[in-house]
Amino acid sequence: MAATRHNERDGLSDLRRDRQRKSGKMAPSPSKRKERSEDRAKDRGKEKAPGKEGTDKDRGRDKARKRRSASSGSSSSSRSRSSSSSSSSSGSSSGSSSGSSSSSASSRSGSSSSSRSSSSSSSSGSPSPSRRRHDNRRRSRSKSKQPKRDEKERKRRSPSPRPTKVHIGRLTRNVTKDHILEIFSTYGKIKMIDMPVDRYHPHLSKGYAYVEFEAPEEAEKALKHMDGGQIDGQEITASAVLTPWPMRAMPRRFSPPRRMLPPPPMWRRSPPRMRRRSRSPRRRSPVRRRSRSPARRRHRSRSSSNSSR
């Protein structure tokens, strides 16, 4: 009996130990829990630290890459830099998921910047064929327009004909055609003298005359000597008369003959409207005049009554 009891106690003690071991494995002490939580937090902090450093480095590299691509404008160099930066960023951030995402974003930004720089360099370097054609057309048009402008300028620059006609003003009424012919014939041959006459006094002039010389030099000579000179004691004026430009006859445009409209049909013709003359003239209201007859009659009646008395 004693041996059986001793065996039972040993078995119970073994069972308790097993339970204690299991309970120790399943539920550790609070001190051990704190230690384990601290260790885990440290491990996480260590893992996050290289990830953050990798993201900061990637951002700085992206900015530097963009500046370099904008300044240089070469697509090949930007592509090589983006590939090297993406490989280095992927190697440094292989332990963390955030590092891998940032490396992929940086590689995308690098590829987009390289594509933009390549497109800008290609657009600035060589113009499209459509633009070249447009520029060539503009140049050809400008070349064709130049000779026309030169012709217009030559026409404008052509010297105006020198005047041969002189206007003489402020003449007295005593001066005649013979006097002007005698004075101005000393400067050259005179073609014509025009001296308009007053309408109401045909033997008197209007106070001015036109003298036309054969050569423009003679007209200039007469202007020099006679402008401000005196005829019949009065100072006269002499000025050149510019000949008008010959007017070009405009070509007449013959208008087509107008077609005569056919007469309207009989049933559409309206009867001729005759002006109705009023047979009886308009009656005017008679002007009322004061009649003195009744007053005279009264006077007569009174006189007759007085005579009868």
UniProtKB/Swiss-Prot annotation:
GO terms for molecular function: RNA binding. Residues 70-129 have a biased composition (Low complexity). Pfam families: RRM_1. Keywords: Cytoplasm, mRNA processing, mRNA splicing, Nucleus, RNA-binding. SUPFAM superfamilies: RNA-binding domain, RBD (SSF54928). Residues 1-17, 35-61 have a biased composition (Basic and acidic residues). Its main location: nucleus. Residues 130-146, 154-166, 270-302 have a biased composition (Basic residues). Residues 1-166, 249-309 are annotated as: Disordered. GO terms for biological process: mRNA processing; RNA splicing. Transmembrane segments: none annotated. GO terms for cellular component: cytoplasm; nuclear speck. It is found in: Nucleus; Nucleus speckle; Cytoplasm. The keyword RNA-binding applies. Residues 164-243 form the RRM domain. Belongs to the splicing factor SR family. Component of the active spliceosome. Component of a splicing-dependent multiprotein exon junction complex (EJC) deposited at splice junction on mRNAs. The EJC is a dynamic structure consisting of a few core proteins and several more peripheral nuclear and cytoplasmic associated factors that join the complex only transiently either during EJC assembly or during subsequent mRNA metabolism. Putative component of the spliceosome which enhances the formation of the ATP-dependent A complex of the spliceosome. May participate in mRNA 3'-end cleavage. Also mediates increase of mRNA abundance and translational efficiency. This is RNA-binding protein with serine-rich domain 1. It comes from Xenopus tropicalis (Western clawed frog). The gene is rnps1.
